Amino acid sequence: MRYGGNTSCVSIDAPGERPLLLDMGTGLRYYGKRVDPDHLFQGSCLLTHLHWDHVQGLPFFAPLLREGSSLDVYGPAQTDGRTLDEVVSSTIRPPLFPVSVDELPGDVRFHDTADTDFEIGAFKVKARLIPHLGPTLGFRVEWNGRSLAYLSDHQQPCDGSFSVTPGAFDLVDGVDLLIHDAQYTPPEFAVKATWGHCTIDYAVWLAEKAKVKQLALYHHDPSRRDDDLDALLSCAVESGAQHGVDVIAASEGLVVELA
């Protein structure tokens, strides 16, 4: 598979800064293999929401198997009153998993987050609630004049029209790189309009509207074959080029440098 098969996880690396991760899907295990084993991992994660494909990698993140390692997780506050810690910990414990989060040698700290701006080291982070199923955040990260927005799961209007909430637009406006949900084609969306995602066409439209420099199509449908993605990407590239947006498809191990 050229595009890969793990679920959502992106790493942001900047000189002099601790690692900043976006989501903790099964790709987190893959990322863990890249971490220098001679150094204790100390980093942070911006968690969009609590669906399994965004948290499954946490108990398999090998760097947390060392005492002294740490991961600060910033994710959406829940509407039922439970904390982020309570919800994640309820899924990673016996009998669902051999050990609990508290039993990991490393330290995992959870921070309930809503519509807010904050800093992690020199990273300036903007979090905004965006449409999806359940409390979901999108993020904008700025560092040294560079900017990235991450909207991994983003519900397009269910009637198939193109519009965007003020919070979501606030995240993507003028960014250097937009990593955006691009799960469906229009015929697929017509059948799954309430499933919390959007079309590739919508992602390209939003990038054009927000004057984004580069769009990375993300959260590919799991049934998609490599050749299918190639064809869909080709159409998106052509559409983006008409409005000055460079369109790429996210793939496992892809590195994008922001100048």
Where do the PLM segments sit?
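Active-site flanking residues adjacent to catalytic metal/cofactor-binding acidic residues
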Residues: 22, 48, 150-152, 180-182, ...
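Histidine- and/or cysteine-centered catalytic micro-motif in compact active-site loops
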Residues: 130-131, 142-144, 153-155, 182-184, ...
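Cap/insert and terminal regions of metallo-dependent hydrolase folds
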Residues: 157-251
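Short, basic, glycine/proline-bearing loop/turn elements
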Residues: 148-155, 189
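Binuclear metal-dependent hydrolase catalytic cores
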Residues: 1-149, 159, 169, 229-259
